[in-house]
A protein has these predicted regions:
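Juxtamembrane C-cap of transmembrane helices in multi-pass membrane transport proteins
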Residues: 16-30, 35, 42, 80-90, ...
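Hydrophobic/aromatic residues within transmembrane alpha-helices
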Residues: 28, 35, 39, 86, ...
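Hydrophobic transmembrane alpha-helices of multi-pass small-molecule transport proteins
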Residues: 47, 51, 70, 120-139, ...
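Helix-helix packing/entry segments at the starts of transmembrane helices
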Residues: 9, 95-101, 168-187, 218-254
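Specific transmembrane alpha-helical segments of multi-pass solute transporters/efflux pumps
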Residues: 54-95, 99, 134, 214-232
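Glycine-/small-residue-enriched transmembrane alpha-helix faces in small-molecule transporters
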Residues: 1-37, 82, 130, 143-171, ...
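Hydrophobic alpha-helical transmembrane segments of multi-pass integral membrane proteins
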Residues: 5-13, 34-50, 66-67, 121-130, ...
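Specific alpha-helical transmembrane segments that line the substrate/conduction pathway
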Residues: 34, 41-45, 84-115, 158, ...
Length: 298
């Protein structure tokens, strides 16, 4: 019971941290590629320190598992680039709600590999699709501009690449999660190094924001997340993961004054309700592992 309680607060804290990342991305004032590069570099250093402090040997890697981890890292970094670009075009809250379609992306991907999808999951999938349609309804009636629609598209694309990351990570069960994250952010450093510029050490360079993104939102957050997943059953981690979009919407309102209108709230509520039903296995006849093996954290 004590381990479960520890897992609950670790998961809750991880989701609270994750919900504030959008604000730090925008407050940095840097191009998306630079924000992601520094997040990867500082995050890699933080994760390396945590791994060394754990005194556990690094998971053995074969050529195939290393390649899969790198491919997962590419997908994860592309996901960050797309999501952070969405923040610049639409509100953080709306981006986050659309981003929570990712479990359904994973369901559809699983079908390509022969995984059976129950009628109940199809029901949740169509309900989430209905939520997306409602979110888009203001655009379909001409009330929004092309930049708004681009933001929605970027958030959906980010969800796709996060789901792809989760699908690849499923194949890496022999590797400790912290070690997977370390390889992934190192991959991000290599990917984005050509686009990085020398930092300024003057007072106008956002070092406090970047250090927070790397240490807190990457190193500490992933350490808490993976530790919680090891302690908690899937239904609890699935339910606690919905702290993330709620916090993102609240932070967006407090920091930038953005709020969802009634139509967006209705569409977002449908998406989050469908994602909860999918993750927690609502309506399934037989006891089974809930959800699709994805924990929402960016």
């Amino acid at each position: 019971m004590r381990e479960r309680q520890k897992g609950v607060w670790q998961m809750s804290l991880a989701m609270l941290i994750s919900g504030s990342i959008g604000a730090f991305v925008l407050l940095s004032g840097l191009p998306v590629t630079e924000v992601v590069f520094w997040r990867c570099l500082i995050g890699a250093i933080a994760l390396f320190i945590f791994i060394r402090m754990s005194r556990k040997p690094f998971s053995p890697l074969t050529r195939i598992t290393l390649l899969l981890a790198i491919l997962g890292g590419i997908a994860l970094v592309v996901n960050w680039l797309l999501l952070f670009a969405a923040y610049e075009r639409i509100s953080i809250g709306l981006s986050t709600v659309v981003y929570n379609t990712q479990p359904f992306m994973l369901v559809l991907m699983g079908m390509l590999f022969g995984e059976r999808v129950s009628l109940v999951k199809w029901g949740w999938l169509f309900l989430a699709f209905g939520g997306v349609v409602i979110l888009l309804s203001t655009e379909l009636t001409g009330a929004r501009g092309a930049d708004w629609l681009a933001g929605i598209g970027l958030a959906l694309a980010a969800a796709f690449f996060y789901a792809l990351t989760a699908l690849i990570t499923r194949k890496l069960k022999s590797i400790a999660p912290q070690h997977i994250a370390f390889i992934q952010v190192l991959t991000g450093v290599a990917m984005l190094l050509p686009f990085a510029r020398m930092p300024s050490f003057s007072g106008d360079f956002p070092w406090p924001v970047l250090l927070t993104l790397g240490i807190v939102h990457t190193g500490i957050m992933y350490q808490l997340l993976y530790s919680a997943i090891q302690k908690l059953p899937t239904p609890i981690t699935g339910s606690l993961s919905f702290i993330y979009p709620v916090v993102a919407i609240i932070v967006d309102n407090l920091v930038f004054g953005n709020s969802l209108n009634l139509t967006q709230l209705a569409g977002g509520a449908l998406i989050l309700f469908a994602a909860a039903g999918n993750n927690l296995g609502w309506g399934e006849k037989k006891p089974r592992q809930c959800g699709v093996g994805i924990k929402t954290a960016n």
